[in-house]
């Protein structure tokens, strides 16, 4: 197989990222950029090495918690590459533990997922959080609304919008986790989101999104057309 440098430019992971953004790359392509080189002994490219890592570990989370010895068990992964992988995953964990700060601007569901994934993914109960935003989508305050099964009796519009009024927020964004690990919205999720949207409209407060966090991904109800 030809080396990555000999591929058509629009197929090379680095050029693809520069032209289309990191979101356009597969997990294997992102890993290839971290690894930078393949295994000369086997003739594997960096992309091949990325695919081998994905085959060995069922999920990125398992890969992120692997020891250097476990990473080096993959052909072509030596101490240097194992250390680079662990450094990247540790940075991701530290980023995920950093709370959003007042003044931080809401930019995308992906950014919210990146901030809350590490905090919420291991919780055994559902946590419902409201992010209160100003007219420029900058964070005013993060408010914990409830903990437990998500039902209308636990997430009441009065409890949600009282801090919105106190902070004079122009918009609000909701985040909650699914302990099952599957971020697919339940009927209750959809019903509560619709109810909160209607109350927000009456109060002149924009409900920007409701983002559900799972083990390996998220669902944005705004992207789904619910909001």
From Swiss-Prot:
Organism: Syntrophotalea carbinolica (strain DSM 2380 / NBRC 103641 / GraBd1)
Residue ranges occupied by any MPN domain in the UniProt entry: 105-227
Keyword vocabulary terms for this entry: Hydrolase, Metal-binding, Metalloprotease, Protease, Zinc
Motif placement: JAMM motif: 176-189
Protein name (database record): UPF0758 protein Pcar_0065
Binding positions for Zn(2+) per the UniProt entry: 176, 178, 189
MF-aspect GO terms: metal ion binding; metallopeptidase activity
Recorded family membership: Belongs to the UPF0758 family.
Pfam entry (one): UPF0758_N
InterPro entries, sorted: MPN, RadC_JAB, RuvA_2-like, UPF0758, UPF0758_CS, UPF0758_N
Domain of life: Bacteria
GO-annotated biological processes: proteolysis
């Amino acid at each position: 197989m030809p080396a990555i440098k000999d591929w058509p430019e629009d197929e090379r992971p680095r050029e693809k990222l520069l032209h289309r953004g990191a979101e356009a790359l597969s997990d294997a392509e992102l890993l290839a950029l971290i690894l930078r080189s393949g295994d000369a002994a086997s003739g594997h490219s960096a992309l091949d090495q990325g695919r081998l890592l994905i085959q060995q570990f069922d999920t990125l989370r398992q890969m992120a918690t692997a020891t250097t010895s476990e990473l080096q068990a993959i052909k072509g992964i030596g101490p240097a590459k194992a250390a680079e992988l662990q450094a990247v995953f540790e940075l991701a964990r530290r980023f995920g533990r950093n709370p959003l700060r007042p003044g931080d601007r809401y930019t995308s569901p992906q950014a919210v997922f990146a901030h809350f994934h590490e905090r919420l993914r291991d919780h055994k109960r559902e946590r419902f959080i409201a992010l209160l935003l100003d007219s420029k989508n900058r964070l005013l305050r993060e408010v914990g609304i409830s903990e437990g099964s998500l039902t209308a009796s636990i997430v009441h519009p009065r409890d949600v919008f009282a801090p919105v009024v106190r902070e004079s927020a122009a918009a609000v964004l909701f985040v909650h986790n699914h302990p099952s690990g599957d971020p697919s919205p339940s009927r209750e999720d959809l019903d509560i989101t619709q109810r909160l949207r209607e109350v927000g409209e009456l109060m002149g407060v924009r409900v920007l999104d409701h983002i559900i966090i799972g083990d390996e991904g998220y669902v944005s109800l705004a992207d789904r057309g619910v909001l």
